Amino acid sequence: MNFGFITYIIGWILNFQGLFLLVPCIVSMAYNEKSGFAFVISSLISLTVGMLFTRKKPTNKSFYAKEGFITVALGWIALSVSGALPFLISGEIPNVFNALFESISGYTTTGATILSDVESLSKGILFWRSFTHWIGGMGVLVFVLCILPLADGNNMHLMRAESPGPSVGKLVPKMRSTAMILYGIYAALTVVEGILLLFGGMSLFDAVTTSLATAGTGGFGIKNNSMADYSMYIQNVVAVFMFIFGVNFNIYFLMLVRKPKEILQSEELKTYLGIVLVATVVIALNISGSLSSIWVALQQAFFQVTSIITTTGFSTVDFNHWPELSKFILVGLMFMGGCAGSTSGGIKISRIIIAWKNLKNEISSFVHPKRVQVIRLEGRKVGNDVVKSVNAYFVLYALLFIGSMFLICIENGSFETNFTAIAATLNNVGPGLAGVGPMENFGGFSPLSKCVFMFGMLAGRLELIPMIILFSPWVWKNKRSNKKKSLKEAI
């Protein structure tokens, strides 16, 4: 294990974090708020630790898949801890568990909160909550790789460990160029949404924070009623962009290079569109009886369907009061998630397609045992290694869900609350049902349960494997001499 190089990369993450923390400081200063001091102190702490870790570049640059997973897991934990500092130092979230929960929820783009009154927070803290969504949406290491080629030719190990979906590929030959293209598209879409929200009469602050939260498919609102207090125009703009950010970013790259044929052939995109369309129509019909018209029902249904399937978590209504069929569909969408290569959480559409095709092939093999079965996705053959990884993902996901559920149920809360709380955090959705519904929060859970949720949020955002590897004892078995050498080099 190359501890020296892992520490070096984490140091650069903290250096960038120190710079990120200065942005909400400017917001606090603009509104003449005391929270600006908290961001300055937090920035200095992050920069100090970061510079300590990066003052000496390690000579050993051997970096493999194991180091990639460990670096990503530790990097996100370090990012979350430093991101919690402004909440604690400002005194606006004085409890350590709550501050860390809010920070992890922000970076993992979950949007679950322990706060009952977000409108009481300062503008700087509100901006920081939304900004953590934007930082975490595309991935902090993706951003760092845009600026610094830290791992030289081994950047793919970092990208693979952090990127959402069963596999990650290059849009262009160089991994760093791929990262820059992805972030360019990400930033451009964020700006376009913000401009459209301004046209709808939103204030500049509201438009910026909402755009940041939508882009990361996070869902931290700046109003206690989430998006319910805004006009239908604004709600529709947000709904459309939630859908847009749930699409694989490769599709937008194909648009830029003018390859419409490949876009139209995308099986994942067509499945995503189909699920959103069917779910919207079914829910609209199911709730239309209690609303003024079918058009209002369609608007509300489309907003909530896109919000949940993309794991953004914004809400315009309290869907806790919707019929059971509608709630059942929303819970199902929590697990599905958006497309691979998007900022969405959840299992991902591509994994579901691969698992479904593999299941059909296995059933078919009983009837035709000698037939060669091939799985194809987006016109390409899916390798056996990818199929195995998808199968392993589902098994690991189920075990993690069951284990988390067991620990949460120790508190004796309602089954509906506990089940959807795990689903909402592990899939990075945010709101669940009952006690963790769209108008509720996670503040009432014990520190143990909050730790379970925090682990689930990180595991869900990082596609399970990095967090599992981090806590696997066999990974850390190494020759004592090598470990001492690497740690000495890191310091």
Annotate each language-model stretch with its function:
Residues M1-I491:
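Membrane-proximal intracellular helices of multi-pass ion channels
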